[in-house]
């Protein structure tokens, strides 16, 4: 039986002047999986995300989504196809309410301009769906509170809600638990697991506890190239991964 891949890259390369940031990466993301992209700082993880969403143009290689070549498509077209990215840096509007932020995302899905100036009555038609999305991430009780007043974990949940508003088939999560305390990490991890139902998630994540808890498949990058792949048990047992993260070869560690 053939494997159903929602996203594939073939010999993906990104070169800057005198530097190769992504080096012949062949990524295969299985439909319905939570797939983690990990590696030490500077490994090329975020650059891969930027290539997938056309924030950067590949030097060489091919990107396939549902078997269709999207390598030359623009960012907006890729998003309309169903590849939607939730950013590492907060992308919500801090001085709008939680509900208003989700309504803005829903307007994007409809292809409209952002009607900040229109009366609530005109935008009320979006409230039902917005509240459904807030309920899906546990924010329904905070719908009418100002976003800037929310703790970091709730802001992250709101970012996920606004991403869900665009109905992604493939959700790209860039460091979803970065900067969080333990309690928020657990809440957001549980939320990612919940929203992964009926969709595929590709995430960049440094927290290996989160990766071990969530990821069906892991790809480890080092210096822009794939070091190894597999489930958490396979990857964590690979001495090259320990060396990449700790800078110490496994045999050196044993004799230390």
Spans of model-derived segments:
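Glycine-rich phosphate-binding loops of nucleotide-dependent enzymes
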Residues: 2-256
């Amino acid at each position: 039986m053939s494997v159903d891949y929602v996203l594939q890259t073939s010999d993906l390369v990104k070169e800057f002047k005198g530097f190769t940031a992504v080096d012949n990466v062949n990524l295969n993301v299985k439909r319905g999986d939570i797939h983690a992209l990990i590696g030490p700082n500077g490994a090329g993880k975020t650059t891969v995300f930027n290539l997938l969403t056309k924030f950067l143009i590949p030097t060489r290689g091919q990107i396939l989504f549902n078997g269709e070549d999207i390598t030359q498509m623009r960012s907006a077209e890729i998003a309309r196809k169903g590849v939607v990215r939730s950013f590492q840096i907060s992308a919500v509007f801090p001085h709008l309410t939680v509900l208003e932020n989700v309504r803005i995302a829903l307007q994007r899905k409809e292809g409209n301009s952002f009607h900040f100036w229109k009366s609530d009555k005109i935008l009320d038609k979006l409230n039902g769906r917005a509240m459904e999305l807030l309920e899906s991430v546990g924010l329904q009780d905070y719908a009418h509170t100002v976003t800037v007043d929310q703790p970091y974990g709730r802001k992250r949940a709101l970012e996920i809600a606004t991403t869900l508003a665009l109905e992604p088939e493939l959700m790209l999560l860039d460091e979803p638990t970065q900067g969080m305390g333990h309690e928020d990490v657990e809440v957001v991890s549980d939320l990612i697991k919940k929203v992964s139902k009926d969709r595929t998630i590709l995430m960049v994540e440094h927290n290996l506890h989160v990766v071990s808890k969530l990821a069906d498949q892991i790809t480890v990058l080092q210096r822009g190239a794939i070091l190894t792949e597999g489930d958490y048990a396979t990857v964590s047992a690979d001495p090259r991964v320990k060396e990449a993260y700790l800078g110490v070869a496994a045999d050196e560690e044993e004799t230390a």
